[in-house]
C-alpha cells in the first residue's frame, strides 16, 4: 500500500493551479501570494513580483482562495 503525503499533494496542486493562498506564520504574520515551489523544509511564495523563501517550521496554516482537489486513494 502506497503512503499518501497530503502535504506534498496539497502544495503541488496549489502550485500547478497558481492558486492564491494566504500563509499564516507562527508569529501571526500573513503572506498572500502563489506557491512557486517547495521541498522538505521550505516553501517559495511569490507575491507582487517578489519571492520569499519560508521555512515550513515557521508556517501555521495555508488558506487557499478556492478548495483544493486531492486524490487520496
UniProtKB/Swiss-Prot annotation:
Residues 8-68 form the Sm domain. Keywords: RNA-binding, Stress response. It comes from the Bacteria. It comes from Bacillus licheniformis (strain ATCC 14580 / DSM 13 / JCM 2505 / CCUG 7422 / NBRC 12200 / NCIMB 9375 / NCTC 10341 / NRRL NRS-1264 / Gibson 46). Pfam families: Hfq. The keyword Iron-sulfur does not apply. This is RNA-binding protein Hfq. Gene3D superfamilies: 2.30.30.100. CDD domains: Hfq. One of its GO terms (biological process) is regulation of DNA-templated transcription. NCBIfam families: Hfq, PRK00395.1. GO terms for molecular function: RNA binding. The keyword Membrane does not apply. Belongs to the Hfq family. Homohexamer. GO terms for cellular component: cytosol. RNA chaperone that binds small regulatory RNA (sRNAs) and mRNAs to facilitate mRNA translational regulation in response to envelope stress, environmental stress and changes in metabolite concentrations. Also binds with high specificity to tRNAs.
